[in-house]
Amino acid sequence: MSITTLNIMVAFTMALLGMFTYRSHLMSSLLCLEGMMLSLFMLATIVSLNMNFTISFMFPVILLVFAACEAAVGLALLVMVSNTYGMDYIHNLNLLQC
């Protein structure tokens, strides 16, 4: 395992720990999710370059598309919750249930 791969795995682990630690605000959770997706994208790119298969070059692009969709939906949810309730606490999200 190279030092680059180890650093990317540490970045993913730190983002995952941040997701568990800073789960009170929606914005903090979204930033941690983006950090996790970025580290997964970098790891998938390095792995696909090392595999030398042409079909594996599509996986990082597909992962990046899903990350962009996740960010758009998360920001739309953040705007909706902050406009409706005036704050972005996650414990207030259960108020959205019927």
Curated annotation (Swiss-Prot):
<keyword id="KW-0679">Respiratory chain</keyword>
<feature type="transmembrane region" description="Helical">
    <location>
        <begin position="29"/>
        <end position="49"/>
    </location>
</feature>
<keyword id="KW-1133">Transmembrane helix</keyword>
<feature type="transmembrane region" description="Helical">
    <location>
        <begin position="61"/>
        <end position="81"/>
    </location>
</feature>
<keyword id="KW-0496">Mitochondrion</keyword>
<comment type="similarity">
    <text>Belongs to the complex I subunit 4L family.</text>
</comment>
<feature type="transmembrane region" description="Helical">
    <location>
        <begin position="1"/>
        <end position="21"/>
    </location>
</feature>
<keyword id="KW-0999">Mitochondrion inner membrane</keyword>
<dbReference type="Pfam" id="PF00420">
    <property type="entry name" value="Oxidored_q2"/>
</dbReference>
<keyword id="KW-0472">Membrane</keyword>
<comment type="subunit">
    <text>Core subunit of respiratory chain NADH dehydrogenase (Complex I) which is composed of 45 different subunits.</text>
</comment>
<protein>
    <recommendedName>
        <fullName>NADH-ubiquinone oxidoreductase chain 4L</fullName>
        <ecNumber>7.1.1.2</ecNumber>
    </recommendedName>
</protein>
<keyword id="KW-0813">Transport</keyword>
<keyword id="KW-0249">Electron transport</keyword>
<dbReference type="InterPro" id="IPR001133">
    <property type="entry name" value="NADH_UbQ_OxRdtase_chain4L/K"/>
</dbReference>
<keyword id="KW-1278">Translocase</keyword>
<keyword id="KW-0520">NAD</keyword>
<comment type="function">
    <text>Core subunit of the mitochondrial membrane respiratory chain NADH dehydrogenase (Complex I) which catalyzes electron transfer from NADH through the respiratory chain, using ubiquinone as an electron acceptor. Part of the enzyme membrane arm which is embedded in the lipid bilayer and involved in proton translocation.</text>
</comment>
<keyword id="KW-0830">Ubiquinone</keyword>
<dbReference type="GO" id="GO:0008137">
    <property type="term" value="F:NADH dehydrogenase (ubiquinone) activity"/>
</dbReference>
<dbReference type="InterPro" id="IPR039428">
    <property type="entry name" value="NUOK/Mnh_C1-like"/>
</dbReference>
<keyword id="KW-0812">Transmembrane</keyword>
<dbReference type="GO" id="GO:0042773">
    <property type="term" value="P:ATP synthesis coupled electron transport"/>
</dbReference>
<dbReference type="GO" id="GO:0005743">
    <property type="term" value="C:mitochondrial inner membrane"/>
</dbReference>
<dbReference type="GO" id="GO:0045271">
    <property type="term" value="C:respiratory chain complex I"/>
</dbReference>
